[in-house]
Amino acid sequence: MKFTRREFMKAQAAASAAAVAGIALPATASNLIASQDLTKIKWEKAPCRFCGTGCSVLVGTQHGRVVATQGDPESPVNKGLNCVKGYFLSKIMYGKDRLTTPLLRMTEGVYDKNGQFEPVSWDAAFDIMADKFKDALKKKGPTAVGMFGSGQWTLWEGYAASKLMKAGFRTNNLDPNARHCMASAVGGFMRTFGIDEPMGCYDDLENADVFVLWGSNMAEMHPILWSRLADRRLSNPDVSVHVLSTYTHRSFELADNGMIFTPQSDLAILNFIANYIIQNDAVDKDFIEKHTNFRKGVTDIGYGLRPTDPLQKAAENPDSGASSPITFEEFAEYVSEFDVDYAVKMSGVPAEKLIELAKVYADPAKKVVSYWTMGFNQHTRGVWANNLMYNVHLLTGKISKPGSGPFSLTGQPSACGTAREVGTFSHRLPADLVVANPKHRAIAEKLWKLPEGTIEPKPGYHAVLQNRMLKDSKLNAYWVMCNNNVQAGANINEEIIPGYRNPENFIVVSDPYPTVTAQMGDLILPTAMWVEKEGAYGNAERRTQFWHQQVKAPEGAKSDLWQLVEFSKRFKIEEVWTEDLIAKMPEVRGETLFDVLYKNGQVDAFGLDEVADERLNDEARDFGFYIQKGLFEEYASFGRGHGHDLAPFDQYHEARGLRWPVVNGKETLWRFREGYDPYVEKGSEVQFYGHPDKKAVIFALPYEPPAESPDQEYDLWLSTGRVLEHWHSGSMTRRVPELYKAFPDAVVFMHPDDATARGVRRGDEIVLASRRGELTSRVETRGRNRPPRGLVFMPWFDAKQLVNKITLDATDPLSKQTDYKKCAVKITKKV
């Protein structure tokens, strides 16, 4: 057997990566050492299907199946390394219960909301689905139809969905599951900088002197980035790591300064740091004078609950993001009350640890990167937390340069690309445009070749509101794609399941597997997965990555893109648009939504001659044109020249991703900084060009308590989250035998003293209950997650233990993002 040098290097890289990750390469994921000529395995690149890190993998296919995956040595993100989930990617598409035909609830051959699922053809599925959507539109108008999408959609799936809903059905009732994970990050960016997404990149990991983790367990949730951080820390004795969390987890193993704080008190800690910087004359005065403004935000803004909820009714300024200008001196006075004594009182963190943390931010010689994920974003004041984090970096000028900056890490593979950049939120359009702005609507209508007034100006129902409107019978035809919200959404007993089973509603769920959500629906559509279709994701560092279709989906399964576009053929313009709108563009009369949205001379501009004969591309060949390229190029036209520039389509198939803005073929590593960002004018040093005056905003915002806290009856905090072995609801990872065996069932992590006080011990069955529901689980008092007294942690991957029966559907009133990290529970021993 002969090896080329390239093949040998790949084998070495794979072996080294596995050793670092602490696992042996499984046989199904370790084919490099076999000659490709003998095994006939074909290798191609694709971004990983799981988290927002955006690792690149090499996918090995043979006889029409994915048989192996390995880390891509040419990837600048993961450099050949994969986490344990990535090593088993080859198995996620081959679960025994993979769906291959549409399933409709029926009794005696007729649709019945209370019937059993029975197979139907795609035509029959689309027939009844179209009837239900048309009926809802006719009876109640566009607000009666909606869609819940995903940060796991490809770019063109999200873009096609946005056009179908916002331009076709003329409803803004489209929201992604990224509402649950990244909406507060979006709100924070837009308030402070006027433009979304991080200014830094992963290169900061090799440049920083100090890493601070806020509500982020990178060791398990972003393990490849953690490996790069660990390498930097362990090879440089002067580098330090600070970790803040409400419980101890694996990231604390590397922490030089670990801090456990009382839930919600991160707001007080951040204001303390700002005060410390000012009191110790560590403010970069030249920077803030040139590049920032100061504003004071309104307070007492509520908790995103139903308007009838007593907490919401009591709010003085419910849902308000208003603010007013103040001076630096007024800001300094505002944060002066947040001294170390106050921060200690609120957080429970010892003073010396807080001061040690504040000193690294204040030290002008230290380059600091702050990372956060769901601990900040899933927070009833998540936007504020993001704003306060930016305050610290702006006050010190530690921003938008190598090794210094705030960095919001992303949870899903394309929450940045598809949810945020494409604009699949209920209030957004591509490239940071919003539906409420008439100029923005006009831009979209022009690019989409639509008559003026097509796009509705009022934001649609966001994720949590969609559930409430389903329950209240105001949203009646509903399509769920690429997510598992009945398992993932908060307060499912009271606010989600009733809406799905409401007899007035028709629920469609597109999924590869019979998830909890699929089983609650009325029609299930079998979906193609990952490399069974051509796709593109955008990761947390603004890196856009493409992949080709590499295998065919099981017969009968169709991609989300195919479903969206094919479904559009069922609607004549007269069935969805008003007569006055059609009168503005009479030539569309008699045409279908497919004709107007996807065969508009732009989306269908690239022919099948651009798809190589040897390439699989089921959607392009079904529709007769290179639809992915057409959708991408039309979408990219929104951002080019406006700070969101994307490279030409074909370039991404060659590259290992490019970080936007991409101008003149060059990607941007650090935004807003002269010399790195092409949009920053020469001689200006820094320009936060999202705002008209090109300045960022430093906000004066207070500490405010959570929506629910422990009391005498419900005496414990509950925090939910993930574990290394499983991703989100586990609908893919729990079908991989090796990952399932590694962590088969969810458990409730709790402090041993709390367990003893309740008469339970490790392994005992317990009942975990809140005011909203209860479940049975088992106690874990050891292991990777070690809560302090008074708090328990439970992961949500286990469909047998739906922890979101217990959680509260309170949200950040500005971002509408759910707070999964704080509610009150009690634990009793199961008898």
Swiss-Prot record:
Matching PROSITE patterns: 4FE4S_MOW_BIS_MGD (PS51669), MOLYBDOPTERIN_PROK_1 (PS00551), TAT (PS51318)
Co-factor binding details: Binds 1 [4Fe-4S] cluster. Binds 1 molybdenum-bis(molybdopterin guanine dinucleotide) (Mo-bis-MGD) cofactor per subunit.
Residues that bind substrate: 796
The keyword Iron appears for this protein: yes
Alphabetical UniProt keywords: 4Fe-4S, Electron transport, Iron, Iron-sulfur, Metal-binding, Molybdenum, Nitrate assimilation, Oxidoreductase, Periplasm, Signal, Transport
Matches recorded under Gene3D superfamilies: 2.40.40.20, 3.30.200.210, 3.40.50.740, Dimethylsulfoxide Reductase, domain 2
EC number: 1.9.6.1
Binding of [4Fe-4S] cluster, residues: 48, 51, 55, 83
Domain 4Fe-4S Mo/W bis-MGD-type: 41-97
Catalytic activity field: 2 Fe(II)-[cytochrome] + nitrate + 2 H(+) = 2 Fe(III)-[cytochrome] + nitrite + H2O
SMART domains: Molybdop_Fe4S4
Protein family: Belongs to the prokaryotic molybdopterin-containing oxidoreductase family. NasA/NapA/NarB subfamily.
Protein name per Swiss-Prot or TrEMBL: Periplasmic nitrate reductase
Organism of provenance: Psychromonas ingrahamii (strain DSM 17664 / CCUG 51855 / 37)
